[in-house]
Every structure is written in structure tokens, then in C-alpha cells.
């Protein structure tokens, strides 16, 4: 069974109902463009985000090919979320997609390019390791109501969870409960890194300002002792103390101060929103309206969630 098939099952199952959010679909008011270094490839990449019609959703435009920001094209890759279609890949999409989902940019074209005119792969810039750069850029130009090509506004749907769902792998899990509003509770545990240890973060509510103030500025983190292994695996070629917070098992944080005492846990929430945004279709919300409780979740669990929905409800 393909991931696309599983998603369609999720979409048509009784587990979720696609209902109106009471809002209209939006897009960005005008284009924004940012250039920066990518974390894993180290390349310099330019991203231009442009307004799009309602119903078109979010999609990347790479080498004049369109790759929808959808679970249909998501690939499991180490340490980042990748979209892949027809041999073209766009890596590390999660922070950008998290910012677009959380701020309500439901429809947009994301042009992305690097200096390698022949390459088949491109990567979204990392900036400071958080979603701040994107949120600030979006706030600068603002949003507008998106209309379809006939000039009509379109209501924005969201997946509302009807029944509890629970998936797990070893000691990590994702549980989601029906809830009239989005709540996210996230736990991480690094017993071998005392400066991080066990952390839990729980969102009180989830409006745009909560994300901008409490989540967007939390940065990617990594364990110092794992950096060499990642470099040997061809990852984090663009990594530096400017685009991640680095923690040593014995010496604690190497580049303080943290922006939040529980910044690593908040960053996981940022990533989760980016990954769940891939459930969006045709300008809808991707993030399920539910109380989501996760502990040590990883990207593969989201896939498992998708399959879980298929197995149980068809
Ligand atoms: Zn991240």
C-alpha cells in the first residue's frame, strides 16, 4: 500500500471529519524572498514564496517542476523531512512548512533554487535553526484572503479527530484525543545528556500569536558527541554554532544562552507542525484538530499514524 493510499484512507475514514474552521483560505499578500545556507548540503539556496489561488495549496517549484507539500511525496530521510517527485528532491522543508501552516499561508508557490543548475536536489536554508526568519518575513508582507480563479473565496477545512488514536514504536508514541481546539503536548528524553534530560512542553492554545511567540524562535539542537557521526554520514555540511544549539553530554550547552529553558522540546513541536502540515490538501489545514500527546516521536511514527488509520478504519 502506498503512502498516498494510506492518506486517502485517512481522509475518507470515520476517524477524522473534514469540517470548516470558520475561516476562509488565505495566501501571502505579496512575494517574499530569502537566501541562506542549507544545513545538510551546505549550499546557498534562494526561496521565493508567491501568492497562489485558493484550492491550490502549498507546493514547491523546483526546476519548473511542481512538488506538492503533501504526505504523498514525503520521504523518510535522516534528520530532515524531504519531498521527492520524479527524481527531484527538496530537503529540510519542515521549518518553512511549519511557519506557513501556523501563520495561515494556506496557498502559495515556493520557488526554490541553488547555484547548481544540473543538480536534482535542493535544500531549504536553515538560517538560525528556527522558523523565525520565515515568520518575520510573512509578518512583514501580511496575508490576504485567497480566491479561486473565478474570484470566489473558499472556506478552510481542517481534519477534526473523532476518536482517540494511539501509535507507538518501542518507548516512543503519538496519541491523539478528540478536542474542540488544537493542543500539543510533547515529551523528549535524553538521559545521556543531563543538560537536556526529560522535558515536557504543553501548549495552552494554538493561535497564530502563540506560535510566533512561543514556538517559532526555538532552534534545532544536536548532541555534540553525535556531530562527527553525522558529518561522516554526509550530513550537516552547513552546520555551525550559528544555526543550531549544541549540547555536550559532559559539558552541557556549548553556545548558550537558550531562548527558552525547554527550547529543544519546543523545537520538536515546531518540527511536528511542519510534518503534520503535509496532511493539508487543496488549501485546507493539515494539522489535525485534536489534543496530540507525543513522546520521543520521530518522522517514521507519522507514517505509522497514516497506516494505522488505514488498518483500523477501512
Ligand atoms: Zn527542526
Regions from the PLM with identified roles:
Residues 1-106, 111-314:
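C-terminal regulatory domains involved in ligand/effector binding and gene-expression control
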Amino acid at each position: 500500500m502506498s503512502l498516498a493510499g494510506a492518506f486517502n484512507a485517512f481522509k475518507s475514514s470515520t476517524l477524522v471529519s473534514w469540517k470548516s474552521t470558520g475561516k476562509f483560505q488565505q495566501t501571502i499578500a505579496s512575494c517574499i524572498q530569502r537566501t541562506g545556507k542549507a544545513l545538510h548540503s551546505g549550499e546557498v539556496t534562494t526561496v521565493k514564496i508567491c501568492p497562489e489561488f485558493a484550492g491550490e495549496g502549498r507546493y514547491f517549484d523546483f526546476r519548473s517542476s511542481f512538488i506538492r507539500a503533501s504526505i504523498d511525496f514525503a520521504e523518510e530521510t535522516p534528520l530532515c523531512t524531504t519531498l521527492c517527485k520524479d527524481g527531484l528532491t527538496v530537503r529540510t522543508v519542515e521549518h518553512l512548512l511549519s511557519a506557513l501552516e501556523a501563520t495561515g499561508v494556506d496557498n502559495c508557490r515556493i520557488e526554490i533554487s541553488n547555484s547548481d543548475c544540473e543538480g536534482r536536489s535542493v535544500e531549504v536554508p536553515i538560517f538560525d535553526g528556527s522558523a523565525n526568519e520565515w515568520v518575520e518575513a510573512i509578518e512583514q508582507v501580511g496575508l490576504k484572503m485567497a480566491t479561486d480563479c473565478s474570484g470566489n473565496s473558499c472556506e478552510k477545512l481542517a481534519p477534526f479527530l473523532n476518536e482517540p488514536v494511539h501509535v507507538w514504536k518501542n518507548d516512543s508514541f503519538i496519541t491523539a484525543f478528540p478536542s474542540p481546539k488544537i493542543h500539543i503536548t510533547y515529551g523528549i528524553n535524553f538521559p545521556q545528556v543531563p543538560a537536556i534530560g526529560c522535558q515536557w512542553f504543553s501548549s495552552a492554545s494554538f493561535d497564530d500569536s502563540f506560535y510566533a511567540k512561543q514556538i517559532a524562535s526555538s532552534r534545532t539542537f544536536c548532541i555534540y558527541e553525535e556531530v562527527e557521526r553525522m558529518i561522516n554520514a554526509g550530513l550537516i555540511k552547513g552546520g555551525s554554532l550559528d544555526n543550531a544549539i549544541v549540547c555536550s553530554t559532559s559539558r552541557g550547552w556549548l553556545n548558550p544562552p537558550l531562548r527558552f529553558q525547554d527550547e529543544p522540546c519546543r523545537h520538536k513541536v515546531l518540527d511536528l507542525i511542519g510534518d503534520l502540515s503535509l496532511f493539508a490538501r487543496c488549501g485546507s489545514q493539515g494539522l489535525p484538530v485534536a489534543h496530540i500527546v507525543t513522546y520521543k516521536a520521530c518522522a517514521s511514527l507519522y507514517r505509522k499514524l497514516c497506516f494505522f488509520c488505514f488498518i483500523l478504519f477501512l
